[in-house]
Amino acid sequence: MKEVEVEGTQILIANVNGNYYAISNKCSHMGNPLSQGVLDGNIMTCTGHNAQFDVTTGKVVTRPKVAFLHPKIKDVPSYQLKVEDENIMVKL
């Protein structure tokens, strides 16, 4: 996985089984960089409170683990991308 900036937007690019996906690099819970998390298959786990996102869609898989609280969390934006030769182009 790799963190890039496109027109001021922080993007996380992940390779899942040879396919590339792009989502926001900011956790929708507390804004932590997802690129500092752990990618297991297509599931990205944020290091902040262990919220999990599907990098292929940006959908929330597991809510943050915060004792006695039920924090609001949204899906993170996902972006279309195209691979040409050795370049990856992200459409915002």
Predicted regions mapped to residue ranges:
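N-terminal pre-ligand scaffold of iron-sulfur
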Residues: M1-G41, K59, K72-L92
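Mid-chain, well-packed structural core segment of small domains
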Residues: G37-R63, A67-H70
